[in-house]
């Protein structure tokens, strides 16, 4: 064919001397090709579609209980209930032996192949009971394993990626804290800056454009910062905040870290409700997932302080899962009829929960020890409308705020319940005392806020009318009823923010943007009353030395930014930042020093004062020197620019004279200058004479 084509071409254009005859690629007569199609086109043949044999939607379930015919129906109900959660099952086969006893495996056919794949993914290694753990595989996997090549090829060696020190932020010799500031630069585009709170001016560590779509969140110990994106979330850390791990969960709206930072919980919407996934942070592996109905609220999981257990509330039950397997504790839920709420102790494996009133049975608050599931304390309550559980951070006390009523009004069908004559009780459980005694404080006014002192024995309450409320401080001591130590009257605050170290508290009105700083040691003196109009957030730093108030663009669009104060309310810094979103201090891990060592340091603290003061003076001197040098450099730059412009102006003098009719206007004197003296009041002082 090539030769014929060249002949035709040469016949039509014999004068084309540049034309070269094409080579002949025809095989010689009798040629036999010894290369197979698999060797020649193996990569393409591997992708060719194969004829479906109808078993893609079949799964094989191994390690099921071997039961007699009389128990087979019950077994089918249990297994069908599990596997039907992932799709419609069209056929099930349980092979049996000669005696009719099941052989320990079964075949299940789903309506669609993707349903079978989902069932394998979710139920493989599912623990049915202590003696039976499912091994679930696709039927087509047998064919895949049959075709394993006999010649083993070693896996390619992956280079080891050295991870930077995740705890370098606590190695600063001066122990300066870090914080992050987020600001929206475009829709779904948030810039995040990381700063170190050094003196006299904060130092910028890193700034990332388009770092997150919405907001960021620190992990409890400050090791990681999490960012939100359409495909899922990612965590960052190290000295330069490089990516540590990513977790694919589209549409994630909220995340929770476990207290020891071993696990991450992501919450994302689905057409039928919320999908919740628990991840292993170090490996990025999905440990377990849940689908909650649309009525479920965020943060439905509660972690124990040591990451050994995670719990969630179900209908008339608590589900407690053990880590790292995430199987139910003792393979069953704890049945608690009428349960309405629960909470873990922040320092011990103790769960507090409360049960509503039912059929003339009083409401009840119970403390349960885990994993023994032993009830260590009960408290019956009457005429209860609602309860809130408040643990003190040190785990020494539990306060149960009880909303009580004098009269209950129901309609004919009991669909609408109204509580009349409301009053409130605070039940204080002394967790460190023998038999856990309980004290009660009753208040007849509306309760607006409650807050424990994190490391002390005091708690504070806002009660009364919204615009003219009272703030009461109570002290809890062993063997005596909680005593009222101070009441600040006619305050317009809505929230209470204790310092992480105790003693100081900020009473905030997050509607008006007013704040009062109170020292709870010296007769509860108000040390300062600054204003920050429209402020919607208050953040204490981990050391309790600084407080930040912020006006977020989520609330308003003008005058957004943040103010920084000392713990006594003295303003340090005002920052106006367009489209400011959030300010977050970086948390610190707990100290490695023992309590005895900490007490020794506090006892001998005066020895360190001289060294600290000298260091502060040197720092301020150095800062003053740097400031003077900076000002001097700015002055030199300005004078250089000024002299340059003066010389340029002098060079243009002849041009100016020519343009102005040969009149030198530079030296003309004029009487058209008017001087006006304006006086205004700067300050007025009034002195009373006796």
Swiss-Prot record:
InterPro entries: EIF3B (IPR011400), eIF3B_RRM (IPR034363), Nucleotide-bd_a/b_plait_sf (IPR012677), RBD_domain_sf (IPR035979), RRM_dom (IPR000504), TIF_beta_prop-like (IPR013979), WD40/YVTN_repeat-like_dom_sf (IPR015943). It is found in: Cytoplasm. Residues 57-141 form the RRM domain. RNA-binding component of the eukaryotic translation initiation factor 3 (eIF-3) complex, which is involved in protein synthesis of a specialized repertoire of mRNAs and, together with other initiation factors, stimulates binding of mRNA and methionyl-tRNAi to the 40S ribosome. The eIF-3 complex specifically targets and initiates translation of a subset of mRNAs involved in cell proliferation. The keyword RNA-binding applies. This is Eukaryotic translation initiation factor 3 subunit B. Component of the eukaryotic translation initiation factor 3 (eIF-3) complex. The eIF-3 complex interacts with pix. Interacts with mxt. It comes from the Eukaryota. Residues 1-33 are annotated as: Disordered. One of its GO terms (cellular component) is eukaryotic 43S preinitiation complex. SUPFAM superfamilies: DPP6 N-terminal domain-like, RNA-binding domain, RBD. It comes from Drosophila melanogaster. CDD domains: RRM_eIF3B (cd12278). The keyword Cytoplasm applies. Belongs to the eIF-3 subunit B family. Keywords: Coiled coil, Cytoplasm, Initiation factor, Protein biosynthesis, Repeat, RNA-binding, WD repeat. PROSITE patterns: RRM (PS50102). Residues 15-25 have a biased composition (Acidic residues). Residues 1-11 have a biased composition (Basic and acidic residues). Residues 595-645 form a coiled coil. GO terms for biological process: follicle cell of egg chamber development; formation of cytoplasmic translation initiation complex; regulation of translational initiation; translational initiation.
């Amino acid at each position: 064919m090539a030769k014929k084509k060249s002949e035709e071409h040469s016949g039509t254009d014999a004068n084309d001397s540049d034309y070269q005859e094409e080579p002949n690629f025809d095989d010689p007569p009798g040629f036999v090709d010894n290369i197979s199609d698999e060797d020649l086109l193996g990569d393409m043949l591997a992708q060719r579609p194969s004829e479906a044999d109808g078993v893609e939607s079949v799964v094989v379930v191994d390690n099921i209980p071997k039961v007699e015919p009389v128990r087979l129906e019950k077994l089918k109900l249990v297994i069908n209930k599990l596997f039907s959660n992932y799709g419609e099952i069209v056929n099930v086969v349980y092979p049996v032996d000669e005696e009719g006893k099941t052989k320990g495996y079964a075949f299940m056919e789903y309506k669609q192949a993707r349903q079978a794949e989902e069932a394998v993914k979710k139920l493989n290694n599912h623990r049915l009971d202590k003696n039976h753990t499912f091994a679930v595989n696709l039927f087509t996997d047998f064919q895949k394993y049959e075709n394993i090549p006999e010649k083993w090829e070693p896996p390619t060696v992956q280079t080891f990626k050295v991870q930077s020190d995740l705890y370098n932020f606590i190695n600063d010799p001066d122990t300066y804290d870090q914080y992050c500031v987020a600001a929206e630069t475009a829709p779904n585009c948030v810039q995040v800056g990381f700063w170190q709170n050094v003196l006299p001016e904060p130092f910028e560590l890193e700034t990332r454009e388009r770092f997150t779509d919405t907001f960021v969140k620190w992990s409890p110990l400050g090791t990681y910062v999490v960012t939100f994106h359409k495909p899922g979330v990612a965590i960052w850390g190290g000295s330069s905040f490089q990516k540590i791990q990513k977790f694919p969960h589209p549409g994630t709206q909220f995340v929770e870290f476990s207290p020891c930072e071993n696990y991450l919980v992501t919450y994302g919407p689905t057409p039928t409700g919320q999908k919740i996934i628990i991840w292993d942070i170090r490996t990025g592996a999905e440990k377990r997932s849940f689908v909650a109905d649309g009525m479920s609220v965020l943060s439905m999981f509660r972690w124990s302080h040591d990451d050994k257990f995670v719990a969630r509330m179900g209908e008339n039950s608590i589900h407690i899962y053990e880590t790292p397997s995430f199987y139910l504790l003792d393979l069953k839920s704890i049945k608690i009829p009428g349960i309405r709420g629960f909470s873990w102790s922040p320092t011990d494996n103790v769960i507090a929960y409360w049960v509503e009133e039912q059929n003339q049975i009083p409401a009840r608050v119970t403390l349960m020890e885990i994993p023994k599931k032993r009830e260590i304390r009960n408290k019956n309550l009457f005429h209860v409308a609602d309860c809130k559980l408040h643990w003190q951070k040190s785990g020494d006390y539990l306060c149960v705020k009880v909303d009580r009523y004098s009269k209950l009004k129901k309609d004919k069908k009991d669909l609408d319940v109204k509580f009349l004559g409301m009053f409130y009780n605070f039940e204080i459980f002394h967790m460190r005392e023998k038999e856990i005694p309980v004290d009660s404080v009753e208040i007849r006014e509306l309760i607006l806020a409650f807050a424990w002192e994190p490391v002390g024995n005091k708690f504070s309450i806002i009660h009364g009318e919204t615009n003219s409320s009272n703030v009461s401080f109570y002290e809890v001591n062993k063997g005596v009823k909680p005593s009222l130590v101070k009441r600040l009257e006619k305050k317009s605050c809505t929230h209470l923010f204790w310092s992480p170290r105790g003693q100081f508290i900020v009473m905030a009105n997050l509607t008006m943007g007013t704040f009062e700083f109170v020292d709870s040691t010296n007769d509860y003196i108000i040390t300062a009353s600054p204003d920050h109009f429209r402020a919607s957030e208050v953040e204490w730093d981990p050391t309790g030395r600084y407080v930040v108030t912020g006006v977020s663009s989520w609330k308003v669009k003008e005058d957004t930014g943040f103010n920084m104060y000392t713990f006594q309310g003295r303003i340090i810094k005002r920052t106006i930042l367009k489209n400011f979103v959030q300010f977050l201090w970086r948390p610190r891990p707990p100290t490695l020093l023992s309590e005895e060592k900490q007490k020794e340091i506090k006892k001998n603290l005066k020895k360190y004062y001289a060294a600290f003061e000298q260091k502060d003076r040197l720092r301020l001197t150095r800062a003053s020197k740097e400031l003077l040098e900076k000002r001097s450099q700015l002055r030199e730059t300005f004078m250089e620019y000024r002299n340059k412009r003066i010389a340029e102006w002098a060079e243009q003098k002849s041009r100016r004279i020519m343009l102005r009719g040969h009149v030198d206007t530079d030296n003309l004197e004029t009487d058209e200058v008017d001087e006006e003296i304006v006086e205004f009041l700067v300050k007025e002082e009034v002195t009373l004479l006796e």
